[in-house]
Amino acid sequence: MSRRGTAEEKTAKSDPIYRNRLVNMLVNRILKHGKKSLAYQILYRAMKKIQQKTETNPLSVLHQAIRGVTPDIAVKARRVGGSTHQVPIEIGSTQGKALAIRWLLGASRKRPGRNMVFKLSSELVDAAKGSGDAIRKKEETHRMAEANRAFAHFR
């Protein structure tokens, strides 16, 4: 038994403009080489572009995109008796959102295009509509979990 106290789970802070934790989580994942102001700039410009494209609230588009990409279940490699099995596991909401953000940014970085603002806004709009690489990644993960359902008892 540990003599130390249990660590408190840190909650994400909200960003200055939208006052939203999800936006701050996204900014922290866009961040490269400690340039947070540039990450904020990229996201806010992408939100403006979404506003122009869809003529709706960009925050609701972001929420819809993340909700659409968030997986319910994932696979984890487990070594059992000399062979490695892909074991399906359920994912909590926080971990699911983190995965969704990672997939959205990965898909937007892979997109061909001019700059990150354009690519990110396009990927978010596509994900909100139910298409795009990030949605495909989620469906692929769900398919993988369904295929390996027989190994669910290895948890």
UniProtKB/Swiss-Prot annotation:
It comes from the Eukaryota. Its main location: plastid. GO terms for molecular function: mRNA binding; rRNA binding; structural constituent of ribosome. InterPro entries: Ribosomal_uS7, Ribosomal_uS7_bac/org-type, Ribosomal_uS7_CS, Ribosomal_uS7_dom, Ribosomal_uS7_dom_sf. It is found in: Plastid, Chloroplast. Disulfide bonds: none annotated. One of its GO terms (biological process) is translation. One of its GO terms (cellular component) is small ribosomal subunit. Keywords: Chloroplast, Plastid, Ribonucleoprotein, Ribosomal protein, RNA-binding, rRNA-binding. Part of the 30S ribosomal subunit. Belongs to the universal ribosomal protein uS7 family. One of the primary rRNA binding proteins, it binds directly to 16S rRNA where it nucleates assembly of the head domain of the 30S subunit. This is Small ribosomal subunit protein uS7cz/uS7cy. It comes from Populus trichocarpa (Western balsam poplar).
